[in-house]
Structures are given as C-alpha cells and as structure tokens.
C-alpha cells in the first residue's frame, strides 16, 4: 500500500488549507489512508463550525456580568446627586443666615456691639432683642402702654393702619392727614373755580357801567380818538339843574350841546370844558352816581387859535371853557377862520348889561374862573335841542 505523503508535502501542495490554522496538526501522525481519508473526509468547515461553538457562552457571560454591574452604577448615581444637592442647599441656607445676622448687627448700637468684637449667632439675636425692647419702652410701645391705649380706644379702633404697628397709630394718623389734605385741596379748587366764575360774572355785569365808574372819579381825561359821539345824559328834558356835569370836545360830528343854565343862576351852572382835541364825546355819569367836581382839562394852542378866530353876536351868550365874554352890538353868525372846519349855528349870543366895542373875540385863559352863561334858542330859554322844533344846531368837522 502506498503511504501517505508526509505532512510537509501536504503543506506544500495545500498551503491554502493550513494557512488558516484550522486544526490539521493533530492528524499529521496518521499513516493509514482510511485515516487520511477520514481525516480528509472531514471538511475543515465542520471544524470551523465546531470550534466557535464554545465562544458564545463566554460572550453571554461577559454580557451578563456587564448587565449586572451597570444597574449598580446607575443606582449609585442618583444617590450621589441627592447628597450633593442636599449639601448645596445646606450651604446656601447657612450663607443666607450669616448674611441676615450681619445685616441685623449693622442696626445694633456700638455700645452693645463694638465694631471689632466678633459675635456668635445667638449673641447677635439676644442683643437685638434687648435693643428692640429698649426702643419700645422709650417710644411708649411697651405692652402696658399698648394695653392702656386699647382700653382708651375701646372697640372704636379703625381697621386701617400699619400692620407692623401694634396700635396702628402712626399709619392711621397719616391716613387722616392725607384725607384732610385732599379735602382742603378740593375745597380750594372749588373755591378758586367759584371765585373765577363770580369774578367773570361781576366783570360782565359791571361792564356797562364801567364808563360811569371811571367818570365818577375825581378827574378824568378823554382818550385820543373815538369812533363817534355817545349819547347825552338820560334826563335831557327835565332841566339843567338836575343834569350831571359832563364834557364834550369841540370838533366832533353829531355832537350835542352842553347843558346850560339861565343867567340868573350862577351857582348851579355846570362846568363845561373841552378836552384836548378829542374827536369824540364822553357820556356823563349815570344818575345813580353822585356828581363829583371835575378838573378842567388844559386847552391846547390849537383850540385857543380857533376860539380867538370866532366872532360872536351880542344876543345869546355861549361860554366855552373859561373864556372872558365880550359881546358885539350887531348880531352875527359864527364863521370859522381856520381852513377845513365849518361851523353853522342858529343860536344867538345873549348880550350882557354893558356893551363893548366891536370885533370882540373869545380869549382862552386857564387861570380865569369859569363863567356861567346860557344858550337860548328863539323864544325858548333853558331848553335842549331835542325839545325845540324849529331850532337847529349842527357842528361839522
């Protein structure tokens, strides 16, 4: 029988089989072909399949050990976190307590807690209690004083107040003071509003009588310009003696004649003085106001020149301002000598007892006393223009 080639030849021919190391080294001592055939009949795949079979139990054991150790680690993790969080909370609490005690020590006086002295927590709390008791006794907030206050007040204590104060006194007093201040502020606001309303109403009610109030003063002066002539006194048709003194300027359109009195009554004559070149007239004071003597306004040079240029007739007498009257024997009309001014007068001058030379003119003099004269219309002495039907009086500027 032919012997099987040595294993070296097999290794040379089939090097790819043994290169993987599949366990053929145990069959190198076999000399029988059957054994070789048996050995060759056994496929290396079977050996490969049989060898890894013991490995799964080892892997499973390792996985079981790892699974057994993993829950232990997971169980120990939360316990350590809880211990750490508890310690952190304790540290935070101690820090907060130390901060609060340090803040409390700041309010203690140096006599109780000197600056360089270290105090424990218990000592700090005891000193604070003593200091608070001392302040309560000084301020009258002791238990005895509070009981006396409660007895005095009884059940009438107000529910409002400071919750920290036992008697709720300071807060209640402050609340009452605020309520009083608000009430006073509202009363003042209402009083101011009423005062403004009353002031406006009085101003509107007294506005029509403003001219009369101004004219009732001791002296007055006419303004520089006016839109037109104002009305004459209310009692025009009664008589000259009852009328209030009032003044009219000379050169004003729609002007009315001043009040005149008879020649015989000199004491009751009113003073009629033309103001300083005012183109409008002032209304006389109302009858309800008492007459007040007026101060004659100074006549200007222009008015003096105008009055000097006027010629008069001897029959009626017209007194303007305080001029000296020089009558003329012949009846003449008033003719202006100043250009731009036109005078037309239907009244006549009343002659005095003594006639003087012709060419008489008005002379303005501030120092001369006022003379009384009356303006007589044809046949009707001491009457106003409105009471006469045939008389005409027109002054144009």
From Swiss-Prot:
PTM field: Degraded by the proteasome.
Gene of this entry: MESP2
Region (Disordered): 28-92, 152-208, 222-295, 351-376
Biased segments, Gly residues type: 180-206
Top-rank lineage group of the source organism: Eukaryota
UniProt-recorded Gene Ontology molecular function terms: DNA-binding transcription factor activity, RNA polymerase II-specific; protein dimerization activity; RNA polymerase II cis-regulatory region sequence-specific DNA binding; sequence-specific double-stranded DNA binding
Subcellular localization: Nucleus
Composition bias type Low complexity, residue spans: 32-48, 58-71
CDD domains according to UniProt: bHLH_TS_Mesp (cd18938)
Disease the record associates with this protein: Spondylocostal dysostosis 2, autosomal recessive: A condition of variable severity associated with vertebral and rib segmentation defects. The main skeletal malformations include fusion of vertebrae, hemivertebrae, fusion of certain ribs, and other rib malformations. Deformity of the chest and spine (severe scoliosis, kyphoscoliosis and lordosis) is a natural consequence of the malformation and leads to a dwarf-like appearance.
The protein, known as: Mesoderm posterior protein 2
Polar residues: compositionally biased ranges: 258-270, 365-375
Statement: the UniProt record of this protein carries the keyword DNA-binding: yes
Biological role stated in the UniProt entry: Transcription factor with important role in somitogenesis. Defines the rostrocaudal patterning of the somite by participating in distinct Notch pathways. Also regulates the FGF signaling pathway. Specifies the rostral half of the somites. Generates rostro-caudal polarity of somites by down-regulating in the presumptive rostral domain DLL1, a Notch ligand. Participates in the segment border formation by activating in the anterior presomitic mesoderm LFNG, a negative regulator of DLL1-Notch signaling. Acts as a strong suppressor of Notch activity.
Cellular component GO terms, alphabetical: chromatin; nucleus
Alphabetized Pfam families for the sequence: HLH
Keywords, comma-separated and alphabetical: Developmental protein, DNA-binding, Dwarfism, Notch signaling pathway, Nucleus, Repeat, Transcription, Transcription regulation
Sequence repeat locations: 179-180, 181-182, 183-184, 185-186, 187-188, 189-190, 191-192, 193-194, 195-196, 197-198, 199-200, 201-202, 203-204
Species, as recorded: Homo sapiens
Parts of the chain that traverse the membrane: none
Composition bias, Basic and acidic residues: 235-244
Biological-process GO terms, alphabetical: heart morphogenesis; mesoderm formation; Notch signaling pathway; regulation of transcription by RNA polymerase II; somite rostral/caudal axis specification
Renumbered residue ranges of the record's region 13 X 2 AA tandem repeats of G-Q: 179-204
């Amino acid at each position: 029988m032919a012997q099987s080639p040595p294993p070296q030849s097999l290794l040379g021919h089939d090097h790819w089989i043994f290169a993987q190391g599949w366990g053929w080294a145990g069959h190198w001592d076999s000399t029988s072909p059957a054994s070789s055939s048996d050995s060759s009949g056994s496929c290396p795949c079977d050996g490969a399949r049989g060898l890894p079979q013991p490995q799964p139990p080892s892997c499973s054991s390792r996985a079981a050990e790892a699974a057994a150790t993993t829950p232990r680690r997971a169980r120990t993790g939360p316990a350590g976190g809880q211990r750490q969080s508890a310690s952190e909370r304790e540290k935070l609490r101690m820090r907060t307590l130390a901060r609060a005690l340090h803040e409390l020590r700041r309010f203690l006086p140096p006599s109780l807690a000197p600056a360089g002295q270290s105090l424990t927590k218990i000592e700090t709390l005891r000193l604070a209690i003593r200091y608070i008791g001392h302040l309560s006794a000084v301020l009258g907030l002791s238990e005895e004083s509070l009981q006396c206050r409660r007895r005095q007040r009884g059940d009438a204590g107000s529910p409002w107040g400071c919750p920290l104060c036992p008697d709720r006194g300071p807060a209640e007093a402050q609340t009452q003071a605020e309520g009083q201040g608000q009430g006073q502020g509202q009363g003042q606001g209402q009083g101011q509003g009423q005062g403004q309303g009353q002031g406006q109403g009085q101003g509107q009610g007294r506005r029509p009588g403003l001219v009369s109030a101004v004219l009732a003063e001791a002296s007055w002066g006419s303004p520089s310009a006016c839109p037109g002539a104002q009305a004459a006194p209310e009692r025009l048709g009664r008589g000259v003696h009852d009328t209030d003194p009032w003044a009219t300027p000379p050169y004003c359109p729609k002007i009315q004649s001043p009040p005149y009195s008879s020649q015989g009554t000199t004491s009751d004559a009113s003073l009629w003085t033309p103001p300083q070149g005012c183109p409008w007239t002032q209304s006389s004071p109302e009858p309800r106001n008492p007459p007040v003597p007026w101060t004659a306004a100074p006549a200007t040079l222009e008015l003096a020149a105008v009055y000097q240029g006027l010629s008069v007739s001897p029959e009626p007498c017209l007194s303007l301002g305080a001029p000296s009257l020089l009558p003329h024997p012949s009846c003449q009309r008033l003719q202006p000598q100043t250009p731009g001014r036109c005078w037309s007068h239907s009244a006549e001058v009343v002659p005095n007892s003594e006639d003087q030379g012709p060419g008489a003119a008005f002379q303005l003099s501030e120092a001369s006393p006022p003379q009384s004269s009356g303006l007589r219309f044809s046949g009707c002495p001491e009457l106003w223009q409105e009471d006469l039907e045939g008389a005409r009086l027109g002054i144009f500027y």
